[in-house]
């Protein structure tokens, strides 16, 4: 018979106090399972963290539950347990993204609204089968996304990568010439913006493109792969490095169409059927890539996108797919890539569920704690680490579970096998 014992446990420690011959005072140490400066034991703290971050229990309900069990705790104490003195967790979370980028050939990304202090904000999850990292920011843009990828660094660099980016973005030649002269490295945003001001570069477009290039240049200099694939739903801010698009998002406009006649329904369903037939063929190619199949699949894609129906809306979807041809067929070059972005959708779903239950964040510490524990929880899930055991290990300071960044690197090295039949790395392309 299995059972669960839930009851409060009150412990009072009496510590011996001695005075030495030279007048110094010696106090007996606390037991190893007592957390310094805390009125609450490690099991209770782990339970609170697990209920709030893993089970999505709100603070009022969690407080009521603890009171019903006889735990003497106030709303303020509960809030402090959830948000304060979490620096070890924050540091471990900050190491996840750099470790993941170090061993990954691709990442999946998405974003969603995440209000903070009554103002609009956004949460961007980045991850793959090895890790997940959530970052909440006040804006969503390509500049913001590059800043997230560059973390924990804060510097900018003008190098060949930056120069190539500016050329692809058609940045004015005069602006490029001014930027290529003088310092090439800048410690932080303040130093970079001061440099732009000194050069007289103040137009919004020029500042934005120049900053994106300098961020991208520093990102590659810090060791991020130039051929790293960013798999997204097609949002423009994610079109950096090598971009791949999600097939489910590409087909979704057709799934949402409401036909006005049987003929329209037949036309829509026919196109959808051919899209999913091609999807299944690409999925089979991914499992067993053969170079001889590549031109055949490309020809089928081109024929599909060249179809025209009596519905302009359907034709528009096909034209949009044709415009994203390289992104949708990226799997032909990189068979390790997923064809959809469901993993990021799942990350967002969990974050949205938490936000709908508990509301938006009100303090900087609360926002940071939500990002950190969401990242740690999802990464534990990816790595097969029991989140309850992880919390126990970290709160008690046992050190039995290695740092998650270490586990990511170990798992990444174990999985690092060149994909069969893969084409040589493609040249990074930030815009179409």
Model-flagged regions — what are they?
Residues 1-18:
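Short, conserved DNA-binding cores of transcription-related domains
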Residues 14-19, 24-432:
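Catalytic center-proximal scaffold of phosphoryl-transfer enzymes
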């Amino acid at each position: 018979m299995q059972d669960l014992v839930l009851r409060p446990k009150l412990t009072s420690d009496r510590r011996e106090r001695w005075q030495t011959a030279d007048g110094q005072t010696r106090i007996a140490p606390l037991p190893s399972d007592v957390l310094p400066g805390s009125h609450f034991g490690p099991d209770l703290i782990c339970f609170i963290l697990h209920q709030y971050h893993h089970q999505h229990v709100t603070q009022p309900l969690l407080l009521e539950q603890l009171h019903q069990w006889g735990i003497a705790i106030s709303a303020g104490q509960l809030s402090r347990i959830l948000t304060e003195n979490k620096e070890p967790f924050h540091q471990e979370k900050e190491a996840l993204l750099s470790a993941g980028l170090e061993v990954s050939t691709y990442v999946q990304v998405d974003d969603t609204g995440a209000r903070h202090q009554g103002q609009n904000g956004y949460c961007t999850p980045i991850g793959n089968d090895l890790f997940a990292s959530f970052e909440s920011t006040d804006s969503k843009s390509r500049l913001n996304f590059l800043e997230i990828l560059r973390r924990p660094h804060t510097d900018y660099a003008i190098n060949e990568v930056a120069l190539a980016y500016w050329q692809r973005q058609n940045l004015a030649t005069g602006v490029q010439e001014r930027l290529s002269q003088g310092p090439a490295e800048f410690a932080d945003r303040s130093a970079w913006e001061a440099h732009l001001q000194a050069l007289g570069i103040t137009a919004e477009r020029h500042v934005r493109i120049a900053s994106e290039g300098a961020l991208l240049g520093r990102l590659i200099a810090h060791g991020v792969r130039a051929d790293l694939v960013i798999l997204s739903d097609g949002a423009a801010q994610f079109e950096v490095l090598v971009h791949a698009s999600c097939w489910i998002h590409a087909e979704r406009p057709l799934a949402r169409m409401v036909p006005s006649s049987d003929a329209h329904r037949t036309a829509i369903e026919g196109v959808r059927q051919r899209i999913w037939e091609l999807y299944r063929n690409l999925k089979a190619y991914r499992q067993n890539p053969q170079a001889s199949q590549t031109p055949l699949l490309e020809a089928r894609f081109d024929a599909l996108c060249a179809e025209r129906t009596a519905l302009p809306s359907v034709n528009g979807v096909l034209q949009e797919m044709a415009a994203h041809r390289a992104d949708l067929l990226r799997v032909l070059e990189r068979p390790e890539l997923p064809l959809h972005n469901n993993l990021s959708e799942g990350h967002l779903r969990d974050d949205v569920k938490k936000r709908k239950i508990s509301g938006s964040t009100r303090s900087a510490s609360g926002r940071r704690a939500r990002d950190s524990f969401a990242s740690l929880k999802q990464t534990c899930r990816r790595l097969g680490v029991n989140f309850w055991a992880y919390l126990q290990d970290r709160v008690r300071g046992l050190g039995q579970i290695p740092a998650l960044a270490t586990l990511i690197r170990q798992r990444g090295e174990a999985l690092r096998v060149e994909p069969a039949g893969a084409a040589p790395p493609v040249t990074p392309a930030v815009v179409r």
